[in-house]
């Protein structure tokens, strides 16, 4: 059985779509998914990147594209009342659902639906309280243990080369993005391409120029 780690932040519409698409994509395969929440902003800061919603033309395109993708894949999705928003409270809830900070699929789904269903305010305090009551948390979401677990999850992801969400890891290989799901499935089905040198050969390509 393959163990797949799904790195996600609920702020990402692509992570939500990948989450919803994953069971169908992996149908017929023998696997276990570990859902690991990370702070997307922490990944961006570490790698010196801007998020797609921080570049105005890209922000508009992102929202158009994810709505089209949801429509095309038959996934229920509405943009939240505002985006980007601060996902920390939600991430701490999902971490607090399990003593090790690793939620099951049910909890992860509830958090994603909180954000991406209904077009509501993801940070609304009353909605957050309702969600907290529903999840029956194992840890105090506002306590130091949860805060440290989220930091540790993010640092662990960075140490493995994760730079964005969603990222799926299996056998030490990283598959980034919703559009990488077919590539992941091909790997799990032992596609012959992965037995070649192409995966590692890209690391040998020299940088021709760099921005100053």
Report the location of each language-model feature.
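Structural alpha/beta surface segment adjacent to cysteine/selenocysteine redox centers
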Residues: 10, 16-115, 198-212
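A short, charged/proline- and glycine-enriched loop
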Residues: 1-2
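C-terminal cap of thioredoxin/glutaredoxin-like
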Residues: 5, 11-31, 99-102, 110-212
């Amino acid at each position: 059985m393959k163990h797949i780690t799904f790195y996600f932040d609920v702020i990402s519409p692509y992570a939500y779509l990948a989450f919803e698409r994953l069971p169908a994509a992996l149908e017929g395969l023998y696997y276990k998914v570990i859902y690991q929440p990370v702070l997307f902003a922490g990944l961006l800061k570490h790698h010196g990147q801007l998020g797609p919603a921080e570049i105005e033309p890209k922000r508009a395109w992102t929202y158009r594209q994810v709505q089209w993708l949801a429509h095309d894949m038959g996934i229920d999705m509405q943009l939240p009342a505002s985006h980007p928003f601060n996902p920390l409270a939600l991430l701490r809830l999902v971490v607090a659902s399990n003593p090790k900070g690793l939620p099951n699929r049910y909890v992860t789904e509830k958090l994603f639906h909180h954000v991406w269903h209904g077009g509501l305010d993801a940070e609304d305090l009353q909605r957050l309280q309702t969600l907290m009551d529903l999840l029956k948390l194992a840890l105090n979401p506002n306590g130091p243990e949860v805060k440290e677990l989220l930091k540790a999850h993010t640092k662990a992801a960075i140490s493995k080369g994760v730079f964005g969400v969603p990222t799926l890891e299996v056998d030490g290989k990283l598959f980034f993005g919703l559009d990488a799901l077919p590539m992941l499935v091909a790997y799990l089905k032992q596609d012959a391409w992965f037995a070649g040198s192409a995966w590692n050969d890209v690391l040998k390509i020299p940088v021709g120029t760099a921005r100053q």
